Regions:
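NAD(P)H-binding glycine-rich loop region in Rossmannoid oxidoreductase-like domains
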Residues: 49-87, 98
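Active-site Tyr-X1-5-Lys
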Residues: 133-159
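N-terminal Rossmann NAD(P)H-binding glycine-rich loop of SDR-like oxidoreductase domains
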Residues: 3-23
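Substrate-positioning beta->alpha
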Residues: 140, 144, 169-175, 189-211, ...
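Mid/C-terminal beta-alpha module of Rossmann-like enzyme folds, strongest
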Residues: 209-275, 294, 314-317, 325
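Conserved Rossmann-fold NAD(P)-dependent oxidoreductase catalytic core, especially the SDR/UDP-sugar
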Residues: 90-137
């Protein structure tokens, strides 16, 4: 089976490629990063440099494909609405048109950030997603993209993977470790809020399961490691493996929130493109619990995480040490 993978040059992309190749799929890696594309070609992966905003690129790249895994997205907490709309909404429209005309199955990588809000949320199920959430443009665009897919005539599946981490991550863990070195990590509620994180290999595995499952077409699935853990405990796992101590800053949410909210308004008013030091979305992530229920993925996809959080942490730290020694 031949599969078109958008976002192939991103963090998740290489893991999906490995998962599919090791299960005898032929992958067309579609992305914009030529440098990473060249490394994929060196590893005998067919790479197509293209843009999901360009329908012709998609039609040419998908020749002979039976399915599409759509992982490409602009996924940041700040930016211009038109950029999120063009990539995450119009880009998805192009994917839908491609799949409808060529009769391809679609597996869409969405985001559980659509659940985000100013409250604790435990054991959240897929049908608890709001119809609208304007906390940031990324969330708004992902909800719009999901609606487009759900209203289409496609054979589709949607997954919402939570807090991806692993080797190659340039977002969650590196930022926290860097923050710890510089000033310390802000803590609310003594870091006892519960969160889910997910080994990126498990997400790639879940995508393959969704690709292969034709019994529950139209299904939407939360994906996590199924190991809810306190925020401070995650940090402690990493620090213990690294052999360092965590530096923590106790912040008062009631004092910080008005400042962050005001700062966002100022940035929006003056159309400042640079991301503010802190956003309401990031603040909610740090302050409130959010864990996801994955019973549906277990029952319908047969998804059970292959790699535990502690295994993922050990692999990440070991790889980082090797890189440090070689640099």
């Amino acid at each position: 089976m031949k599969v078109l993978l958008t976002g192939a040059t991103g963090f998740l992309g290489k893991y999906v490629i490995n998962e599919l190749k090791s299960n005898n799929y032929k992958v067309i890696a579609f992305g914009r990063n030529e440098k990473i594309g060249k490394t994929l070609v060196d590893e005998n992966v067919e790479f197509y440099k293209g843009d999901i905003e360009n329908l012709d690129d998609l039609f040419r790249a998908s020749e002979g494909c039976s399915a599409v895994i759509h992982a490409a997205a602009l996924s940041t907490v700040w930016g211009k609405w038109e950029n999120f709309y063009n990539i995450n909404v119009l880009g998805t429209k192009n994917i839908i048109r491609l799949c409808e005309e060529k009769k391809l199955k679609l597996v869409f990588v969405s985001s559980p950030s659509i659940y985000a809000g100013a409250k604790d949320q435990l054991d959240v199920r897929e049908d608890e997603a709001p119809e609208e959430n304007n906390l940031n443009f990324y969330i708004k665009s992902k909800i719009m993209a999901e609606k487009l897919i759900r209203s289409s005539s496609l054979n589709y599946m949607i997954i919402r993977p939570r807090g991806l981490f692993g080797i190659g991550d340039t977002s969650i863990i590196p930022r926290l470790l860097d923050l710890n070195k510089k000033i310390g990590i802000p803590l609310f509620a003594d870091g006892k809020q519960k969160v889910d994180i997910t080994c990126v290999e498990n997400v790639a595995y879940a995508l393959r399961l969704a690709l292969e499952n034709n019994e529950y077409l139209g299904g939407i699935y939360n994906i996590t490691n199924d190991e809810p853990i306190e925020f401070k405990e995650i940090l402690t796992l990493f620090f213990n493996e690294i052999g360092t101590k965590g530096k923590y800053l106790k912040w008062n949410y009631n004092l910080i929130f008005p400042l962050v909210s005001f700062m966002e308004r100022v940035y929006k008013f003056f159309r400042i493109e640079k991301e503010p030091p802190l956003t309401k979305y990031t603040l909610y992530l740090m302050r409130y619990s959010q864990t996801l229920n994955i019973d549906k993925a277990k029952k319908e996809l047969g998804y059970y995480p292959k790699i535990s959080v502690i295994e993922g942490v050990k692999k990440y730290v070991e790889h980082s040490r090797k890189n440090d020694r070689n640099s």
